[in-house]
Amino acid sequence: YWYGFNPRQKDFLAEADSGFLVMACVDLQFAFAVPYEVLEPIIPYLNVTENDEGITHWHLQINPPENGEYQFVIPKKGEKLSLKKYEIQLPQIQPVKIAV
């Protein structure tokens, strides 16, 4: 899974007393709610896309389960962060039947 995290989003979360970046995955019944205090120190170690004005976004990559746990990739440190404790269950939604 891949997400783009832009400077405006970073600034918004930084201003919150308790900010969370929530990342959902279309095919999973849970999402990841990562506290900004966990995310902030690893931002300098993420890959970026830049233009003449600076960073347009940081690349957030989640790898498929390793030992049953999804992992957040921190490429410039060669590390991974387990996302297990940041999983939040999503409600199961039943498909809606539409009369034609």
Stretches found by the model and what they are:
Residues Y1-A31:
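Catalytic cores of nucleic-acid endonucleases
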Residues L28, F32-V100:
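Non-catalytic C-terminal interaction segments of nucleic acid-processing enzymes
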